[in-house]
């Protein structure tokens, strides 16, 4: 992926920030957002030319890319929102909260935001544009999706040591058949989202 999408924005702004989230759909664990700024007129080379939507990449490639993105980015930030907060405010608002926290932690402060998706609610006076399927179109959004995905996967792998009965290291909290069977057998843990109801278990 190249930086063709960012190029016209760099003519107006120095600090363009790509933002994406991962973990909206799982039954357990946090929603995670990442924000990434590259130098103005940055040209990806080497392994960074492989950057794509994180879902389209092999795990090993994502890990390598995440490390290299962190080295070459001007600034990056990651934010987590817990299952408790997700249950309190709903997953959409929790996603906005994660994205805003990631943006607020950046230095320098971005001048323009490119947000994956079709809507966003900002807490900062920074102009933005939402891009549907931005993680497959926009270099900086794809980079954010990769570091968010790797961060969350590692988080869930660590959780698997505390809650081995749920198989988090295999499905990362997503509603697979094995995960639903584990919930049926053991109930929900402290890291499960109580507001995500399973009709197959008779929950309403």
Curated annotation (Swiss-Prot):
Membrane recorded as keyword: no
PROSITE patterns reported in the protein's UniProt record: RNASE_H_2 (PS51975)
Gene Ontology terms: biological process: DNA replication, removal of RNA primer; mismatch repair
Cofactor(s) required, per the database record: Mn(2+); Mg(2+)
Catalyzed reactions per annotation: Endonucleolytic cleavage to 5'-phosphomonoester
Residue span(s) of domain RNase H type-2: 14-204
Chief place of localization: cytoplasm
CDD domains from the UniProt entry: RNase_HII_bacteria_HII_like
Annotated positions binding a divalent metal cation: 20-21, 116
Enzyme class: hydrolase
Cofactor mode of binding and number, as noted: Manganese or magnesium. Binds 1 divalent metal ion per monomer in the absence of substrate. May bind a second metal ion after substrate binding.
SS bond partners: none
Protein family (similarity comment): Belongs to the RNase HII family.
Protein name in UniProt: Ribonuclease HII
Organism: Chloroherpeton thalassium (strain ATCC 35110 / GB-78)
Source taxonomy: Bacteria, Pseudomonadati, Chlorobiota, Chlorobiia, Chlorobiales
């Amino acid at each position: 992926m190249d930086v063709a999408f960012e190029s016209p924005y760099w003519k107006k702004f120095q600090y363009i920030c790509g933002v994406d989230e991962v973990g909206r759909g799982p039954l357990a664990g946090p929603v995670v957002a990442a924000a990434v700024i590259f130098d103005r007129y940055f040209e990806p080379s080497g392994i960074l030319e492989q950057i794509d939507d994180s879902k389209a990449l092999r795990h090993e490639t994502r890990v390598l890319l995440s490390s290299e993105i962190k080295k070459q980015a001007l600034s990056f930030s990651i934010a987590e929102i817990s299952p408790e907060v997700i249950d309190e405010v709903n997953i959409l608002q929790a996603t906005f909260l994660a994205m805003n926290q990631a943006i607020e932690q950046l230095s320098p402060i971005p001048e323009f935001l490119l947000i994956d998706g079709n809507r966003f609610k900002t807490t900062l006076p920074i102009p933005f544009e939402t891009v549907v399927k931005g993680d497959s179109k926009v270099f900086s959004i794809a980079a954010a999706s990769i570091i968010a995905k790797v961060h969350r996967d590692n988080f869930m792998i660590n959780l698997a040591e505390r809650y081995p009965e749920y198989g988090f290291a295999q499905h990362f909290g997503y509603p697979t058949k094995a995960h639903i069977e584990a919930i049926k057998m053991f109930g929900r843990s402290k890291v499960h989202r109580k507001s995500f109801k399973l009709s197959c278990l008779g929950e309403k």
